[in-house]
């Protein structure tokens, strides 16, 4: 009986959040261990479907770096990185598009649809579909400057590495109206039809900004942002984040992630969240409990 009462209390705790967020859009960047382990993949699919069933509109943007690396290795192609970005020549770009837009994207769609019921379905997209992601070649020197990583100019031609120029939300809105869950591969295209490999964090940020989403949520392999003492920060604003970057508390691969959060907030997204995707049902635990489990970032 006590367990039943406890379950009822959990549902009651979630009720105000369900009421608050019904009809809102959440953009979720899916990556890391949450994409690799079978039990976490199932938990993620269940979380996404739960959001949709209670009236929240989830939009998924996924990564796929390890899968790209594995395919390149199988094909005998070398993976080269500069400052965490994959140098992407034309041949590598073809593999990136095949892996992200095909193998990874469709596996996520199939997983969600396996557990979906009734009239809800997931559908896979790349930037080419409906002109969703207009991209351009990344200004690598400016990118590294913003990340506090200053590199010699001659090292900065990364090939088909791009950045988002524009998000056309029309196809996403049509899918939402028809009860589909969009699953987006971070491949963009320019007006000449050239394909670009784009950091999925910044695609998620741009999509959230274009949709004026309530939240953008990043699944990672860490507990959240850490303060100067190494403790997880439950809530933080942009001013403090910038100070922590200047002081070297936030560094390395976390800088692009928090920059993506800041970019989303600057475009009208209400909150950004960094969650530990290694925790089953981390999305539900963050959104529908008072304490949460990760770090929320506000303006």
Curated annotation (Swiss-Prot):
Q: Which residues bind substrate?
A: 64-65, 86, 197
Q: Which reaction(s) are listed as its catalytic activity? A: N-acetyl-L-glutamate + ATP = N-acetyl-L-glutamyl 5-phosphate + ADP
Q: Which domain of life is it from?
A: Bacteria
Keyword annotations? Amino-acid biosynthesis, Arginine biosynthesis, ATP-binding, Cytoplasm, Kinase, Nucleotide-binding, Transferase
Subcellular localization, as worded in the UniProt entry:
Cytoplasm
**Cross-referenced InterPro entries, in alphabetical order?**
AceGlu_kinase-like_sf (IPR036393), AcgluKinase_fam (IPR004662), ArgB (IPR037528), Asp/Glu/Uridylate_kinase (IPR001048), Glu/AcGlu_kinase (IPR001057), NAGK-C (IPR041727)
- Entries under SUPFAM superfamilies matching the protein: Carbamate kinase-like
Site Transition state stabilizer — annotated at: 29, 257
Query: Please, one GO biological process term?
Result: L-arginine biosynthetic process
Q: In which pathway does it act?
A: Amino-acid biosynthesis; L-arginine biosynthesis; N(2)-acetyl-L-ornithine from L-glutamate: step 2/4
HAMAP family named in the record: ArgB (MF_00082)
The similarity annotation says: Belongs to the acetylglutamate kinase family. ArgB subfamily.
Spell out the protein name for this chain.
Answer: Acetylglutamate kinase
Q: Which organism is it from?
A: Persephonella marina (strain DSM 14350 / EX-H1)
**Gene that encodes it:** argB
